[in-house]
Amino acid sequence: EDYGAATLRPNTLRSYEQFIRCYIKPYLGDKIVSRVTRMDIQKLYRKLKHEGRVHEHPEYGHELSDTMVLRIHAMLHRCLKDAERDHIIPYNPTDGTKLPKNSYKPKQVLDREQMDAFLAAVDKNETWRDFFYTELTTGLRRGEICGLMWQDFDEKAGTLKILRSVNVPKAGELEIGETK
């Protein structure tokens, strides 16, 4: 936790903690970091790909998606790169590993008719109407929308200033920070 606390955003830090707890420790936790080899990493990725999901998914079984394996790799690579830089390990065993191809699936986007129907459904609640209208028409992240204040909206210019983002740290209280 101390390792990334100063440089990572709270949600990223939580994701990394989960990756370590659920995916790295069960397979590499009993191994001294300086003894981890490229082959160990390759086996880890293969194992995660085919049986890394803890709870069985109705469509995918215990397989993790290629995207998830790539996210775990990015986190592990960064940690081991820092360990190499600090001379804790002689080389980064994630370098040169074969990674799954990121199988990009196009995102499903609402068409105009679907968007109008959705907004009509939430129209009765002013807060949710404004929230979803902003989300659907701007591409802002959820935390950025939650961080908006009326003073950020310039009605004459028709613009929004995105100055802050709201996150929910582990304890559950709201935290206002900078945007990405």
Model-derived features: where do they sit?
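N-terminal core-binding DNA-recognition domain of tyrosine site-specific recombinases/integrases
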Residues: 2-93, 104, 126
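Generic beta-structure capping elements
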Residues: 46, 99-102, 163-165, 179
